[in-house]
Design a protein with these regions (language model features):
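C-terminal target-recognition/interaction regions appended to catalytic cores
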Residues: 124-253
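Class I S-adenosyl-L-methionine
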Residues: 1-163
Length: 253
């Protein structure tokens, strides 16, 4: 977990304090898997604090492509329950489906006029990155060779295979982050078009419905931040609806 002193870690303790005051029946927390290994034990301390005030706490790492989100996105889920211990894996099994591909999510957006709205307007790559994109398509490859990368991404910890990569049509995408506009932030080059993803495409890969409004985002940066940092709506639905199903079956009392 790289952001060990991230101020957002404090949100864990805010959740525990809120649970102590309001006593909800359930508390759900989502984060990256590395949060469990934070050297300050923020995640585990929060779990213990919830236990101390009477909650049964379970947590699991899940991959969102198991519930139909078209990306490889691992997340650490914690559910604290005033009732019985919630089996998170059982909830995931209730909604498990075949992985959805990039093609399934965004292929119909290729026909849109890319200049109509901020949502469908691709970013303009640098001259060097445009050459790298062209290289991927000219050679019909999905991973940019090391020698084609800038020197800072050829050595040490910067040699991630997905950086400067092209998405596969027939697979889930890599994890969508706020860096989806830039190929130097991950495998964000479109499978069929010589550009990186648009905000509309990234939102689809995050499982946002097309009717969802991002009108509050006035800039490309704010739009990317909202989309990339979001909890995919499908995950929220699965966890909440799954808990309700367990309640109706009498497994959470």
């Amino acid at each position: 977990f790289s952001r060990r002193k991230d101020h957002k870690n404090a949100l864990y303790f805010v959740m525990a304090r809120a649970a102590k005051i309001f006593r909800p029946n359930f508390v759900i927390i989502e984060n990256v898997p590395g949060a469990k290994h934070d050297k300050n034990n923020v995640f585990l301390n929060t779990a213990n604090e919830l236990k101390d005030i009477g909650y049964n706490v379970s947590f699991e790492t899940i991959n969102l492509f198991d519930i139909g989100v078209p990306q490889k996105r691992k997340r650490l889920i914690l559910i604290a329950s005033k009732a019985n211990l919630v089996n998170i894996n059982e909830i995931i099994e209730l909604y498990k489906t075949q992985p959805k591909s990039v093609h399934w999510a965004i292929q119909d957006l290729m026909q849109l006029d890319s200049q109509d709205t901020l949502m469908d307007m691709p970013s303009k790559p640098s001259k060097d990155n445009l050459k790298r994109i062209d290289y991927l398509f000219e050679n019909n490859i999905y991973d940019l060779p090391n020698e084609q990368r800038p020197p800072c991404h050829q050595k040490g910890n910067h040699t991630y295979k997905s950086i400067y990569g092209r998405l596969h049509w027939d697979e889930p995408s890599q994890t969508i982050t706020s860096g989806f506009y830039s190929m130097c932030m991950g495998r964000y080059v479109h499978p069929q078009l010589p550009r990186t993803l648009t905000a509309h495409e990234a939102a689809r890969l995050q499982f946002f419905p097309d009717y969802f409004s991002f009108a509050e985002a006035k800039t490309r940066t704010s739009l990317a931040t909202i989309i990339g940092n979001a909890v995919p709506p499908k995950l929220s639905f699965v966890l909440v609806h799954g808990i309700l199903r367990l309640l109706n079956r009498g497994e959470c009392k």
